[in-house]
Amino acid sequence: MKKSLLAVMLTGLFALVSLPALGNVNLEQLKQKAESGEAKAQLELGYRYFQGNETTKDLTQAMDWFRRAAEQGYTPAEYVLGLRYMNGEGVPQDYAQAVIWYKKAALKGLPQAQQNLGVMYHEGNGVKVDKAESVKWFRLAAEQGRDSGQQSMGDAYFEGDGVTRDYVMAREWYSKAAEQGNVWSCNQLGYMYSRGLGVERNDAISAQWYRKSATSGDELGQLHLADMYYFGIGVTQDYTQSRVLFSQSAEQGNSIAQFRLGYILEQGLAGAKEPLKALEWYRKSAEQGNSDGQYYLAHLYDKGAEGVAKNREQAISWYTKSAEQGDATAQANLGAIYFRLGSEEEHKKAVEWFRKAAAKGEKAAQFNLGNALLQGKGVKKDEQQAAIWMRKAAEQGLSAAQVQLGEIYYYGLGVERDYVQAWAWFDTASTNDMNLFGTENRNITEKKLTAKQLQQAELLSQQYIEKYAPEAWARMQKLKAQSAVKTGNK
């Protein structure tokens, strides 16, 4: 909620308070009116000095006139003085003073002041954090039709922040704000309809709200709508439209849109493959600290592409940045690079990264960690632990791990030798993605089995395929059904 609240803290000098027209008054006339004690003129003169309009910019003079108007109880000036203390413009930043002046204006019903006072209580700036008090002021601003207040009320109910969480109420307040063009609220409504929060799930309506935000130029709306076109959710799948929207968001600096645009360009999903342009966008995302951008940049350097030479040093550098942020795939790939380099010290680094990724369920890392333990490279040889990690990878459907686990059972490495288990895992790998090693090893192992053991192995394999190779299992069932139809038609 903090991010959204910061977006609705009202900080601008103009267009926030409506001032009675002073007519076409020049600076000297304005000074005369201000010196005579006219509060409106004092505030306007403060504006002139603040912006350097018809005079030299002078923040000290501006603050003096703002204060004179505010001390007369002129509500717009009280609010403006609060802004100046909040921003530290013309005076040292002083949140406590900002709260004092905001409260004076808020108590007189100025919605902008009520909104900002609510934020001060929410963030604990100049006062102790008091979420209930913040909601009180947000509500007052919202009930006067202030879209920022309505958004903040939506946020409060969405997060359960100062009120009991209530998605229905959140949707109602977001709707009020969104109807006034509040883009954050449009995005929140898009999210709520996509998840069925406080409303029946409706991806088409979700897309409509994201579109409203995107059309207004909001980078998040563009990002979310691009995602919907990419996956074909709520709209017809359209990679070209997705690329356009990702590009619009990326140009505004959105790091997620930047790496996703890079991926579309690298894969050629909306035209010819453009790895060089992809590299540029990955780098923009990566340099903002986005772990996905760092991963994709590293991966492109790792494998290379037309116009992009392989660069191991760059790959290691960017994989490391992503890995240090906890990206499991980057950790696994970084470990793989170190393992290939060959020295004992590099093998140790590899094992460290394999362990981090494997603990998060990354199957390639589990497989590689199992192999390192089997070979005793970078770690003390431990066949029992190797078998444990290899099984974890095999049970996630990695056919190479299924073959390796079969070999572990075939040779009795860290487990009791079991040809039935070995055959079942080899057959699972063979069926999974037509792994040739699985097929060859299965045929070799079959010679070790009795007829009864082969039946047991076949039954066990069926269970493994159904559980650990579901796509292969679905293909098998489809073929069986087709075969049954053909047989029935004869």
Swiss-Prot record:
Q: Which residues bind Mg(2+)?
A: 122, 159, 161
Cellular component terms, GO, for this chain's entry? cell surface
Quote the InterPro entries the UniProt record gives. Answer: Sel1-like, Sel1_AlgK, TPR-like_helical_dom_sf
Query: Which superkingdom?
Result: Bacteria
Q: Which UniProt keywords are given for this protein, alphabetically ordered?
A: Magnesium, Metal-binding, Repeat, Signal, Virulence
Q: How is the cofactor bound?
A: The physiological metal is unknown.
Task: Note the coiled coil stretches, chain numbering.
Answer: none
Plastid among keywords: no
> What does the record say about induction?
More highly transcribed in logarithmic than stationary phase. Protein is not detected in bacteria growing in culture but is detected upon infection of mice (at protein level).
What is the annotated signal peptide range for this record? 1-23
Q: Which residues cross the membrane?
A: none
Any one Gene Ontology molecular-function term assigned to this protein's record: metal ion binding
* Intracellular or extracellular location(s): Cell surface
Q: Which GO terms describe its biological process?
A: negative regulation of immune response; negative regulation of neutrophil activation
Report the cofactors.
Answer: Mg(2+)
Q: Where are the Sel1-like repeats?
A: 39-74, 77-109, 111-145, 153-182, 185-218, 222-254, 256-290, 291-327, 328-361, 364-397, 399-430
Family annotation (PANTHER family): ERAD-ASSOCIATED E3 UBIQUITIN-PROTEIN LIGASE COMPONENT HRD3, SEL-1-LIKE PROTEIN
What role does it play? Upon host (human neutrophil) infection interferes with productive FCAR signaling, inhibiting secreted IgA (SIgA) effector functions and probably avoiding neutrophil activation. Inhibits the SIgA-mediated oxidative burst by neutrophils, decreases generation of ROS (reactive oxygen species) by neutrophils and reduces chemotaxis by neutrophils, all of which are SIgA effector functions used to stimulate the immune response.
Something else known:
Preferentially encoded in ExPEC strains (extraintestinal pathogenic E.coli).
Provide the assembly information: Interacts with human secreted IgA (SIgA) at least via resides 244-260.
Which named protein is this?
Secretory immunoglobulin A-binding protein EsiB
